[in-house]
From Swiss-Prot:
Subunit comment: PSII is composed of 1 copy each of membrane proteins PsbA, PsbB, PsbC, PsbD, PsbE, PsbF, PsbH, PsbI, PsbJ, PsbK, PsbL, PsbM, PsbT, PsbX, PsbY, PsbZ, Psb30/Ycf12, at least 3 peripheral proteins of the oxygen-evolving complex and a large number of cofactors. It forms dimeric complexes.
Protein name (Swiss-Prot/TrEMBL): Photosystem II D2 protein
Gene3D superfamilies per the UniProt record, alphabetical: Photosystem II protein D1-like
Family: Belongs to the reaction center PufL/M/PsbA/D family.
Lineage, uppermost ranks: Eukaryota, Viridiplantae, Streptophyta, Embryophyta, Tracheophyta
Length: 353
């Protein structure tokens, strides 16, 4: 019996090998298998957004002007969510709502579902791109893992939250002022700023900004392998083997400032990864809770005392009154399909009034 030792080689490359060779070859812009998902989805999402903000009105869904064609600017234009009556319909162009009529599809808000779904899969494609490239050059996949934070936030805010509510109508529209309106809505109807998951998200994002600033400044402060270039960006040879800054000096400096300091580069950089990604994930979990109408902290004893005693008021009770005002003033204009009318006497007023 003969035993052949070695690698099995095929006489001919099959279709998979041909595609793999073309997709993953070295070129200026890497394509890869992930590019089959990333590039079409990103193209359609961005293209749909530009089309909507340029030409498409929100008159039929929100009673608003939302395009450059109607006189909006970059801050006020948006691709608006479908009407509440359409609930969670995917609003496919060939579906029963639009029936292949592109104009009707745009009027119904079909561009929003188009942008949201292609955007979500585009972000997932970008994360897979980082996985694929990391594997190709034999790096660990922490970049892709970190990018799961923005994906979690996007999916929770634009997809999971409206799925928990009555329809896509209550998701954010894709525009600057539209996002601001959504933030006010979250505060008024969910008291979002008093939600512990929002607090963790703020701590993560702002803490990461602080860490980034401190880290960048510290490295700049402790450079020692300086060259003779005209400025910092030309002074270093990118292929030099040795490091260009002193971790020991940085450790000594922050030990004197705070009494404690990072002494290990791996722990330092993992912490800089952990803080923002955890913050984003906590925010995403909080929004999933809001989709189910879970409440934030309620300090009922303060509300009861404020209702009984006109002279007792806290920042919490003032915020509760502000939230009531947001709901009363916002609901009527934000949900015109409900035909809400609030008499002047039921609109909330603070104790000072």
């Amino acid at each position: 019996m003969t035993i052949a030792v070695g690698k099995f080689t095929k006489d001919e490359n099959d279709l998979f090998d041909i595609m793999d060779d073309w997709l993953r070859r070295d070129r200026f812009v890497f394509v890869g298998w992930s590019g089959l998902l990333l590039f079409p989805c990103a193209y359609f999402a961005v293209g749909g957004w530009f089309t909507g903000t340029t030409f498409v009105t929100s008159w039929y869904t929100h009673g608003l002007a939302s395009s450059y064609l109607e006189g909006c600017n970059f801050l006020t234009a948006a691709v608006s969510t479908p009407a509440n009556s359409l609930a969670h319909s995917l609003l496919l162009l060939w579906g029963p709502e639009a029936q292949g009529d592109f104009t009707r599809w745009c009027q119904l808000g079909g561009l929003w579902t188009f942008v949201a779904l292609h955007g979500a899969f585009g972000l997932i494609g970008f994360m897979l791109r980082q996985f694929e490239l990391a594997r190709s050059v034999q790096l660990r996949p922490y970049n892709a893992i970190a990018f799961s934070g923005p994906i979690a936030v996007f999916v929770s805010v634009f997809l999971i939250y409206p799925l928990g509510q009555s329809g896509w109508f209550f998701a954010p529209s894709f525009g600057v002022a539209a996002i601001f309106r959504f933030i006010l809505f979250f505060q008024g109807f969910h008291n979002w700023t008093l939600n512990p998951f929002h607090m963790m998200g703020v701590a993560g994002v702002l803490g990461a900004a602080l860490l980034c600033a401190i880290h960048g400044a510290t490295v700049e402060n402790t450079l020692f392998e300086d060259g003779d270039g005209a400025n910092t960006f030309r002074a270093f040879n990118p292929t030099q083997a040795e490091e260009t800054y002193s971790m020991v000096t940085a450790n000594r400096f922050w030990s004197q400032i705070f009494g404690v300091a990072f002494s290990n580069k791996r722990w330092l950089h993992f912490f800089m990864l952990f803080v923002p990604v955890t913050g984003l994930w906590m925010s995403a979990l909080g929004v999933v809770g809001l989709a189910l109408n879970l409440r934030a902290y309620d300090f009922v004893s303060q509300e009861i005392r404020a209702a009984e005693d006109p002279e007792f008021e806290t920042f919490y009770t003032k915020n509760i009154l502000l939230n009531e005002g947001i709901r009363a003033w916002m609901a009527a204009q934000d949900q015109p399909h409900e035909n809400l009318i609030f008499p002047e006497e039921v609109l909330p007023r603070g104790n000072a009034l």
